[in-house]
Amino acid sequence: MAGARSVGSLPVPNVQALAEICNDPDEHIPERYIRPEASSEEVINNYQGDMAIPIIDLKKLLCPQSSEEECVKLRSACQYWGFFLLINHGVPDEVIANLKRDIVDFFSQPLDTKKEYTQLPNSLEGYGQSFVFSEDQKLDWADMLYLHVHPSDSRDLRFWPTSPASFRQSIDAYSSETKSLALCLFEFMAKAVGAKPESLLDLFEEQPRGLRMAYYPPCRQADKVMGLSPHSDAGGLTLLLEINNVQGLQIKKDGKWFSIDAPNGALIANIGDTLEILSNGKFRSVEHRAVINPNKERISAALFHYPSENMVISPLPEFVKDGKVKYRSISYLDFMKQIFTQQLDGKNRVEVLKLDQ
């Protein structure tokens, strides 16, 4: 987001290049990438019924005959899971296909070509890694390209690849098509808990959005590394697109990790810390992580929706009908500075804002 331009991440080795070396049986994974916790915690892979991640159908939300029932499902998903699969979302297949093609082509290019878009000091935008602030810190097994996509005047085109030639156009089209989708979700989320539909809509409608495209190389010792450290997202809402249908996202619920396998064509939506605070805990952000496949690369694109950097985030009156405020207020700019100057650490940053009940 724009307000985090003054912070950045330390440069680290390119993981895609490192993976090519480490997949040689005679080579060892560098110690900074070894994560004992990657294989020590229970993971649920096959689940159903009440233990299955909710699926929300946008067509049913928009249909007067089924909207009320689907709103109940949406409320439950946001309250108990913090994640849901979104089907019939209305983003054109062609727009998604073009973005997928160009992201795959970008990460397939020679390293020297991708390095033309390397992050600069004190900047989050560009090609590299995020949340690296110490030379002793454990590292994630991933390379990323992060861009500010909205508003358009916040875009720094130095970091927008010109190869593939259609990449900029594909990103712009995807950003435009998902805007109305996100706003629709904000509207129905508020409606689902009896608040005014515009209560969330007004806070996010013309505010910053960022796109993080991530490449997770395969690793023959996948149980020893971590693609993305456990964390919760800082913003309001995240829409995740799986690019090549390789599973790797896991979310934490009731102390256990659940693997998420999205149906082809679905988007994965999740609640961010900001929305948890604004809703006074009626919605909750959830700790999640990315794990590595031993044989296949995984590629994803996460679109983050932020409020204004000038906003003070605190529970909205519409969500505090019982008079019990559960979170301290904090300026969003200060909140983001905390996040982008520390390594990822579960849900710690939102937990410290909770008031004793």
Swiss-Prot record:
Transmembrane residues, as ranges?
Answer: none
- Thermal profile, per the record? Optimum temperature is 30 degrees Celsius.
So which tissues is this one expressed in?
Expressed in shoots.
Q: Which catalysed reactions does the entry list for this protein?
A: melatonin + 2-oxoglutarate + O2 = 2-hydroxymelatonin + succinate + CO2
| Residues annotated as binding Fe cation | 231, 233, 288
As one GO molecular function, the record gives: metal ion binding
Output a single Gene Ontology CC term carried by this record: cytoplasm
How activity varies with pH?
Optimum pH is 8.0.
Its chief place of residence is: cytoplasm
Q: Where in the cell is it found?
A: Cytoplasm
Broadest EC class assigned to this enzyme: oxidoreductase
Q: Which residues form the Fe2OG dioxygenase domain?
A: 207-307
Keyword annotations: Cytoplasm, Dioxygenase, Iron, Metal-binding, Oxidoreductase, Vitamin C
Pfam families noted in UniProt: 2OG-FeII_Oxy, DIOX_N
**Cofactor stoichiometry and binding?**
Binds 1 Fe(2+) ion per subunit.
Necessary cofactors: Fe(2+); L-ascorbate
Amino-acid positions noted as binding 2-oxoglutarate in the UniProt annotation, renumbered to this chain? 298
**EC number of the protein:** 1.14.11.-
Family designation: Belongs to the iron/ascorbate-dependent oxidoreductase family.
The record's annotation in PANTHER family points to: OXOGLUTARATE/IRON-DEPENDENT DIOXYGENASE
Q: State the protein's purpose.
A: Involved in melatonin degradation. Catalyzes the hydroxylation of melatonin to produce 2-hydroxymelatonin.
State the name under which the record lists this protein: 2-oxoglutarate-dependent dioxygenase 11
